[in-house]
Amino acid sequence: MGIQKLRIALKAYETSLLNDSCTQIINAVETGGVKAIGPIPLPTKRRIYCVLRSPHVNKDAREHFEMRTHKKIIDVYKPTDDVMENLRKLDLAAGVDVEIKSL
């Protein structure tokens, strides 16, 4: 019995890189003739950092910085060996973190 489902989780700080990577993965899966569901957007995580502007005085003067982590999931049902090989050959952007699980 082979793999029934692949879950591909993508994370990135920039939405444009994430969307481009999603389209590349979906195109690679669809060329193999396999059904893919997604990309399913997940909630965006926000990390906010508060930094003092001055090193010594003026505690009231502060700056806020935020990092947003965008996530998406793609489910691939009954992947074949050709699809797995297509996914391995993909060259995705450096700012995108890809995690693949077999379910």
UniProtKB/Swiss-Prot annotation:
PROSITE patterns per the UniProt record, alphabetical: RIBOSOMAL_S10
GO process terms (BP): translation
Localization per record: Plastid, Chloroplast
Cross-referenced Gene3D superfamilies: Ribosomal protein S10 domain
GO molecular function: structural constituent of ribosome; tRNA binding
Any single GO CC term annotated in Swiss-Prot or TrEMBL for this entry: chloroplast
UniProt main location, coarse: plastid
Pfam family membership, one: Ribosomal_S10
Keyword terms, alphabetized: Chloroplast, Plastid, Ribonucleoprotein, Ribosomal protein
InterPro entries reported for this sequence: Ribosomal_uS10, Ribosomal_uS10_CS, Ribosomal_uS10_dom, Ribosomal_uS10_dom_sf
HAMAP family: Ribosomal_uS10
Classification via NCBIfam families: PRK00596.1, rpsJ_bact
Reported function: Involved in the binding of tRNA to the ribosomes.
Sequence similarity: Belongs to the universal ribosomal protein uS10 family.
Assembly: Part of the 30S ribosomal subunit.
Protein name from the UniProt record: Small ribosomal subunit protein uS10c
Species name: Emiliania huxleyi
Lineage: Eukaryota, Haptista, Haptophyta, Prymnesiophyceae, Isochrysidales
